[in-house]
Design a protein with these regions (language model features):
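Conserved HGGG/HGGXW glycine-rich cap/lid loop of the alpha/beta-hydrolase fold
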Residues: 8-62
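Active-site loop/oxyanion-hole signature of alpha/beta-hydrolase fold enzymes
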Residues: 49-93, 258
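Gly/Ala-rich beta-loop-alpha elbow adjacent to hydrolase catalytic centers
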Residues: 94, 98, 102
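Flexible "cap/lid" loop of the alpha/beta hydrolase fold
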Residues: 103, 107, 113-146
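Conserved alpha/beta-hydrolase catalytic His-Asp/Glu region
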Residues: 127-129, 147-204
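Conserved serine/cysteine hydrolase catalytic core
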Residues: 187-231, 240
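Catalytic histidine neighborhood in serine/cysteine hydrolases
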Residues: 231-247
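Catalytic histidine-centered segment of alpha/beta-hydrolase-like enzymes
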Residues: 244-253, 257
């Protein structure tokens, strides 16, 4: 499906029916990794309509030359919400760069968001410079896999803390999306990455259920930057997963699904938990 947002034909797919749930994918890839990583949690949580857009410059959504900074990308995301999720409250999930955009949505529209899931989130402007970032480590390695991997696949493997068959499968899934990414757009956005406003300062605390999941061995962002968000999320669970780097959804998929399922249960029960007469 497509919808026009500021002249950009936004490609998106949906799954299920019910309350709106917006999925924001990471940089350089597309909506397919979000569907693969998070769809399993809905087996036990019917009643949600998932929206999986390809963000500008990714997948099947183009990025016009005038799109040069993250504020503009956020406006596109907000426009997508206005066009497709019309007048409804929404739950938002974001992985990596998508997590940064999800925080932007909260900064602008927290009053209409019922819950938020952030996986390996942080400011990309801090990538590789955060003091708590561990060095690249490999905790599980299966060298027998190398004989069946292409040079491109081998080049991507060092980003994984757990280098097993699941990692290879994850690389192969994402290669198709990597081939579609608009490299000129990526250069523009990475040169002016952070929002013009302080995403760490929400207008008020986000009082609804949240889940923040970080990788203990994430050499790109670390985990302490994510911990610093907790003051803004009084209803958040914060989890740091061992045997997980920046590709946590692949390396610790089962644990992520368990945590996300529990969080979604809290989102579903939230109205009943709150005494609105107090």
């Amino acid at each position: 499906m497509q919808c026009d947002v500021q002249g950009i034909p936004m490609y998106y797919e949906t799954a299920g029916e019910g309350r709106p749930f917006l999925m924001l994918h990471g940089g350089y890839i597309d909506h397919r990794h979000m569907a693969h990583d998070l769809e399993p949690i809905f087996a036990n949580h019917p009643g949600w309509k998932r929206f999986y857009p390809d963000l500008p410059g990714h997948g099947r959504t183009p990025a016009p030359d005038w799109l040069t900074n993250q504020d503009q990308v956020l406006e596109i995301v907000l426009g997508f919400i206005d066009r497709v999720i019309v007048g409804s409250r929404v739950v938002v999930a974001g992985v990596s760069r998508g997590g940064y955009l999800a925080r932007g949505v909260l900064a602008k529209r927290s009053e209409s968001v019922d819950g938020v899931l952030l996986v390996t989130p942080a400011r990309h402007g801090n990538a590789g410079r955060v003091e708590d970032n561990p060095h690249n480590v490999v905790l599980v390695r299966d060298d027998s896999l190398l004989s069946n991997m292409s040079p491109v696949e081998k080049a991507l493997l060092p980003g994984y803390v757990v280098q097993n068959q699941k990692a290879v499968q994850g690389i192969r899934r994402n290669l198709l999306a990597l081939e579609l990414t608009d490299q000129a757009f990526q250069k523009r956005i990475m040169s002016d990455y952070e929002f013009s406003f302080d995403v760490d300062q929400l207008p008020s605390s986000f009082e609804r259920p949240a889940l923040i999941v970080a990788g203990r061995q994430d050499a790109l962002f670390g985990y302490l930057e994510s911990w610093k968000m907790m003051a803004q999320f009084p209803r958040a669970t914060f989890a740091v997963l061992d045997r997980a780097g920046h590709y946590l959804p692949t390396e610790q998929s089962d644990l992520l699904h368990t945590l996300a399922s529990e969080w979604l249960q809290r989102v579903e029960s939230y109205p009943a938990e709150v005494d609105h007469t107090a």
